[in-house]
Amino acid sequence: MKKTKIVCTMGPNTNDREMMRKLIQNGMNVARFNFSHGDHEEQKFRMDMLKELREEEHTNTAILLDTKGPEIRTGILKDGKKITLKEGETFTLTTEDIVGDNKRVSITYKGLVQDIYKGCTILIDDGLIGLRVESKTETEIVCSVVNGGELGERKGVNVPNVAIRLPAITEKDKDDIRFGVEQDIDFIAASFVRNAECVLEIKAYLKELGAPYIPIIAKVENAEGIENIDEIIRAADGIMVARGDLGVEIPAEEVPHLQKMIIQKCNDNFKTVITATQMLDSMMRNPRPTRAEVTDVANAVYDGTDAVMLSGETAQGKYPLEALQMMVHIVETTEEHLDYDSILVKAGDHLKSGVSSAIGYASVLAAANLNARCIITPSVSGATTRVVSNLRPRQEILGITPNERTLRRMSIYWGVRGLKSLEFHTTDDICSGAIDLAQAKKCVDSGDIVVLTAGIPSPSVQREKGSVSNMMRI
């Protein structure tokens, strides 16, 4: 079984029930619903289908809602036709609501005029088109075209190294999150997170909706997010390394070391981390990936990512199933070559103080020394399972919980197989019940050595933030 989890983006391809079923059967752990596209009716159709299929297939496939976020886009064009911008020409961005042409186009963020300055760079459509600001009025930004090309409708606008004063959460995001809560989603991927305040605003809104339990994965997509990465990691439940916009906002050659830095920081802080964007991009058109793409996926696994993500590859590419199967194959092959002993030593060197960390590390160390069959982590909240997962043991981790939401959240935890249990009330119940369940699911056999770690309520143990792991048995 692969340990690194895979997030697949839903789209036109997955309107086909059997295609969605095949993705579930072939290794998709989390289904991503991108709310930059489609309406609620379309998204509900796919979510309902996924829920039906995971029941039929007896899986815990989680649902991740990816918000559109406070992004800037260009407006519509005359007759919907693309325009051609040529190097050296003058092109104007306007906050007025107009139908664009080859002279000017509207933008969705009216405050951009105040945020930018003469001489700064504006990039459109993932950086394919580059503009330099020459002058501005109250409603217009007059630019010269530095890098020309074809411009279509509603393309993304990036302004590198400029602090944009967009709201942390838009009205559309609120509407989409409200809809997601009604649909019992498992994660929110918050787009264009710039600081901890962005995360806290979304958490406050979730509390208003009566859903404070939904984890927030912060998407770091610009220089401001990188600058504030430590406070964002503290505030969020996880991080998505969104390399698409990130590689536009900052020099592309900076992305690899930033990816490694973010993954390491998330590992050190027991936070989920997803590596995303263009991982097998060529498989949108071709049945096989490039060697560079294979290496990219493998390096993310070596770096310590919890999950890797497929975007357009599964949403609308020509080879959605083949892309997933290739991702699984790359991940499994790479994991065969991981140096688990070195990983464990490194984890010990960076171990944070606290009972949960100490017990988790002792459990993984014992499992390694005894060549245990697996590590069993009974947990209502999933906190114990998360700690053990972050230590990256060679052994399979059985995350056992009576909580359906926790079970689905475990779908993104590295190395974890989630199992649904009954409620346990005593320490003996926890231990015997968890082992009985593991045997019933054929995860262990009689005579196998297993390590079990859990959190047992105890007045003598200082409770850390959230739950505390304070018991280990062999």
Give the positions of each predicted feature.
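Non-catalytic helical/linker scaffolds that mediate oligomerization, partner binding
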Residues: 1-474
